[in-house]
């Protein structure tokens, strides 16, 4: 019974992240929604790992790797956003067409 609740929560988080990623106009908000999507995938990995084989930690270890990749993605993404803000004075996605210049 607990697995269903966690999976439903994960689907809700994934849906909120996708909706936010599609409708977001701000780069920082888009990065936050992308991290929300990755965290919902981590919840699924840990839940299915515990559901199918509770003695092995394959899903948990893979989840740690996904968290490390998400941290690197956030650091690089925020560095790019701060660089764009320094040059363009805006973090809006529709105002930062870098191919024009």
Curated annotation (Swiss-Prot):
EC number(s) stated in the UniProt entry for this protein: 7.1.1.-
Membrane-crossing residue ranges in chain numbering: 2-22, 61-81
GO cellular component: chloroplast thylakoid membrane; NADH dehydrogenase complex
Protein keywords: Chloroplast, Membrane, NAD, NADP, Plastid, Plastoquinone, Quinone, Thylakoid, Translocase, Transmembrane, Transmembrane helix, Transport
Membrane topology recorded in Swiss-Prot or TrEMBL: Multi-pass membrane protein
Entry keyword Membrane: yes
Coiled coil: none
Keyword Zinc among UniProt keywords: no
Top-level EC class as recorded in UniProt: translocase
Annotated compartments: Plastid, Chloroplast thylakoid membrane
GO biological process: ATP synthesis coupled electron transport; photosynthesis, light reaction
Catalytic activity of the protein: a plastoquinone + NADH + (n+1) H(+)(in) = a plastoquinol + NAD(+) + n H(+)(out); a plastoquinone + NADPH + (n+1) H(+)(in) = a plastoquinol + NADP(+) + n H(+)(out)
Gene3D superfamilies for this protein: 1.10.287.3510
Domain of life: Eukaryota
Entry's Gene Ontology molecular function annotations: oxidoreductase activity, acting on NAD(P)H, quinone or similar compound as acceptor; quinone binding
InterPro entries documented for this protein: NADH_UbQ_OxRdtase_chain4L/K (IPR001133), NUOK/Mnh_C1-like (IPR039428)
Family per record: Belongs to the complex I subunit 4L family.
Function: NDH shuttles electrons from NAD(P)H:plastoquinone, via FMN and iron-sulfur (Fe-S) centers, to quinones in the photosynthetic chain and possibly in a chloroplast respiratory chain. The immediate electron acceptor for the enzyme in this species is believed to be plastoquinone. Couples the redox reaction to proton translocation, and thus conserves the redox energy in a proton gradient.
Complex formation: NDH is composed of at least 16 different subunits, 5 of which are encoded in the nucleus.
Name assigned to this protein: NAD(P)H-quinone oxidoreductase subunit 4L, chloroplastic
Organism: Dioscorea elephantipes (Elephant's foot yam)
